[in-house]
Curated annotation (Swiss-Prot):
NCBIfam families in the record: AcCoA-C-Actrans (TIGR01930), FadI (TIGR02446), PRK08963.1 (NF006516)
Transferase in keyword set: yes
GO molecular function: acetyl-CoA C-acyltransferase activity
Organism: Serratia proteamaculans (strain 568)
Catalytic center residues: 99 (acyl-thioester intermediate), 392 (proton acceptor), 422 (proton acceptor)
Assembly and interaction partners: Heterotetramer of two alpha chains (FadJ) and two beta chains (FadI).
Descriptive protein name: 3-ketoacyl-CoA thiolase
UniProt EC number: 2.3.1.16
The encoding gene: fadI
The keyword S-adenosyl-L-methionine belongs to this UniProt entry's keyword annotation: no
Classification via SUPFAM superfamilies: Thiolase-like
GO cellular component, one term: cytosol
Top-rank EC class of the record's enzyme: transferase
Pfam families assigned: Thiolase_C, Thiolase_N
Length: 436
């Protein structure tokens, strides 16, 4: 085990997460159809500030992320500062780590607090799969640049005449990895086959996720962390995630056809997370600053770790690489955790990671460790459901998971929680949080 790495300031202050909030998550082209991610981000941050009761001028830094970026607002963080009543002098910058984006935002704010650069910051992320940057072909893009430099009408017409009809077709955002050309679902299929994960196991995990999420909503467990969002022109509202299947039936999952390997596959739309819109944010401070302001933190950030692996095989095993590092840096073992929350990009990816957590062979051959970190107690795992049920606005998921885990730890009287996620590009993230 590596030496523990405490997350404290030079004065010994811990990193406090004072509050967290998100919009309800909505499936693509439903409740938030036509609403860009920047507006979803403003909505979540504005309500977070209002609920906390803190003077917006006290926020010294905002770090926010967006995976599917819009060209007209490339720095979503700064737009949120300018649109939510914060001081114009509040520092703001944007980050992107694919599905682990808000994990990165939280880590960056934590590091700024530890360095003494700031004492109060906000971290989070927002994404919209309903408002997308529809592009143009490379041929048309090049022609438009050349046309802009052409001096005469005849020169411009000559440039346009070289284009073919297909060059005029709009180009949607890529769904495949830039480096490999593989879709996430292709990797999930590979992992299912390589690790012997059956269709039945995947469907069972998806069914479990929806059942637990539906139960959480029915019992009112999420109301303190999910706001009501009013949708322009403000005649309608959304108060709950609209992807959760309250009538989930295991038998219904078997009816769906594979979505990626249509002949021999097992990954379906039902055992994968859907395209989703939403935003989430957390308010962070040094422990002493929270006390000065009379604020009671939800909990504290104990450790974090990021990992990077090969993209050609098992690309979504990031949690299995990042989690051991986060545990080491927290000075704890897997058995010390009260809760474990893993991002469910796909049921196949989730189950593969659970297998690797318990695999001595994986630990020895891939991690250089003598033994596995251990088998996950499913009574601790994704106890309120996961991303398959809630949905996955890419940049918002990490902040959702952190906030949700802290609230559940508080309900259980405290303890330690792991939140971990895979991400495109072979990346992984893991964070340990603590509630007293």
């Amino acid at each position: 085990m590596s030496k523990a790495l405490p997350l404290v300031t030079r004065h010994g202050d811990r990193i406090a997460i004072v509050n967290g909030l998100r919009t309800p998550f909505a499936k693509q082209a439903t409740a938030y159809h036509g609403i860009p991610a920047v507006d979803l981000g403003k909505t979540a941050v504005s309500e977070l500030l209002a609920r906390t009761g803190i003077d917006p001028a006290l926020i010294e830094q905002l770090v926010f992320g967006q995976v599917v970026q819009m060209p007209e607002a490339p720095n979503i963080a700064r737009e949120i500062v300018l649109g939510t009543g914060m001081s114009v002098h509040t520092d703001a910058y944007s980050v992107s780590r694919a599905c682990a984006t808000s994990f990165q935002a939280i880590a960056n704010v934590a590091e700024s607090i530890m360095a003494g650069s700031i004492s109060i910051g906000i971290a989070g992320g927002a994404d919209s799969s309903s408002v997308l940057p529809i592009g143009v072909s490379k041929a048309l893009a090049r022609t438009l640049v050349d046309v802009n430099k052409a001096r005469t009408l005849s020169q411009r017409l000559k440039l346009f005449s070289r284009l073919k009809f297909r060059d005029l077709m709009p180009v949607p955002p890529a769904v495949a990895e830039y480096s490999t050309g593989l879709r996430m679902g292709d990797t999930a299929e590979q992992m299912a086959k390589s690790h012997g994960i059956t269709r039945e196991e995947q469907d069972a995990l998806a069914h479990r996720s929806h059942q637990l999420a539906a139960k959480a909503w029915e019992q009112g467990l999420l109301h303190d962390e999910v706001m009501t969002a009013y949708v322009p022109p403000y005649r309608t509202q959304i108060s709950e995630d609209n992807n959760v299947r309250k009538d989930s039936s295991l038998a219904s999952y078997a009816k769906l056809k594979p979505a990626f390997d249509r002949k021999h596959g097992s990954v379906t739309a039902a055992n994968s997370t859907p395209l989703t819109d939403g935003a989430a944010a957390v308010l962070m401070m040094s422990e002493s600053r929270a006390k000065e302001l009379g604020l009671q933190p939800l909990g504290y950030l104990r450790s974090f770790a990021f990992s990077a692996i090969d993209v050609w095989e098992d690309m979504l095993l990031g949690p299995s690489y990042a989690t051991p590092l986060a545990l080491d840096r927290a000075g704890i073992g897997l058995a010390d955790l009260t809760l474990i929350d893993m991002h469910e990009a796909f049921a196949a990816q989730t189950l593969a990671n659970l297998k690797m957590f318990a695999s001595d062979e994986f630990a020895q051959q891939k991690l250089g460790r003598s033994r596995a970190i251990g088998e996950v107690d499913m009574d601790k795992f994704n106890v309120l459901g996961g991303s398959i049920a809630y949905g996955h606005p890419f940049a918002a998921t990490g902040a959702r998971m952190i906030t949700q885990t802290l609230h559940e730890l508080k309900r259980r009287g405290g303890g330690l929680g792991l939140t971990t996620a895979c991400a495109a590009g072979g990346l992984g993230a893991a964070m340990i949080v603590e509630v007293e």
